[in-house]
Amino acid sequence: TGTVSPAGGNLKEPVTENTKKVARCFYALEQERADRKRYPAVNPIDSYSKYLEYPEFQEYIAGHISPTWIDKVNEIKTRMLRGKEISEQINILGDDGVPVEYHVIFWKSELIDFVILQQDAFDAIDAVTPLARQEFMLNKVVKICHAEFKFNTFLEVMEYFKKMINIFKQMNYSEYESEQFKKFNDQLDALIAEREDK
């Protein structure tokens, strides 16, 4: 286990770089995420786990969770990176300066962030997530990321995904497979059907 606290959060300085060479798993804590109240404040792009590359680990995950789990984890990391790139373009060009499709990609990455990566440690249910629940939520989010949606303006995109994220958050606070959980899941399915371009 290696722990580094680089000055100014600079992850490129020599001690951090050398620690990363020997560490199998690296959590990059980020002040910006903490300031935005996105907890745990772990940067999903700079963080990594080399265990995903180990055949023994891959075999265990395939047998205990799903054969497609690691592929989905890698996919959402790629989507997070694409979302960050688009966020930077929006900051430079403005909301009207990028196509509506870019806003959809950005908000799909926000969906991943809010639903899969963020966690409320003060909530008894959200603080501890069983593997079966993780698999269900990951599959649900990945399915939405694969779906095509129809929007005319970036405001429609933002309002739609904020509504979706809110329902997901309520699911995160509900006991897995409870009536309340199923109710929110049904609401999500109805919301997806409203805009999905089939």
List the model feature ranges, each with a label.
Residues 1-169, 177-180, 185:
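P-loop NTPase catalytic core
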Residues 187-198:
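C-terminal accessory/interaction regions of large nucleic acid-associated machines
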